[in-house]
Amino acid sequence: MIEDTKERAMRCPNCGNLVYPRINPVVIVAIKNDQDELLVTKYAHASYSKFALVAGFIEIGETSEEAAIREAKEETGLDITDLTFYKDQPWGFSSSLIFTYVAKAHGNQKITLEDHELKIAQWVTRNDTYLDPKDDASITSEMIHKYLEGEL
């Protein structure tokens, strides 16, 4: 495969077939409850050991909003509402385009972990400054930092 001179793609020098870059669409959701606490998670089987937010891939035929609602339900058992778009971020490490949202989990819903995905899901407050990932470039870290600063 060689770089094509006209397209942002790779071209097979033998048959001319073009292969375009693939982007994996992903959602991340910052879920807050009625007490303005933030739900943070830790992955069950990943090398990433910091706190994260609910996240997952967008499935074929699904909007990013539908994926955010589905991932929240699958991973935590929570029904979310008031979904508000935060921003997007290209993430070259995994060829992803990340769409982020802030949502609400109203009432006294019970967290039910999807244990093959998550090992921890817990509510935190703005006083839990040990969570602050100031030096991390990820949009997840930005969202957690903004929450702790009272800006999310």
What are the residue ranges of the model-derived segments?
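Hydrophobic pocket-lining residues within nucleotide cofactor-binding pockets
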Residues: 58, 80, 105, 126-129
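Short, flexible, mixed-charge glycine/proline-rich loop motifs
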Residues: 1-6
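The catalytic Nudix box helix
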Residues: 52-86, 101
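Active-site-adjacent beta-strand/loop module that shapes the phosphate/pyrophosphate-binding cleft
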Residues: 89-112
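N-terminal strand-loop-strand
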Residues: 7-53, 79-80, 103-105
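Nudix hydrolase/Nudix homology domain
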Residues: 48-51, 93, 114-152
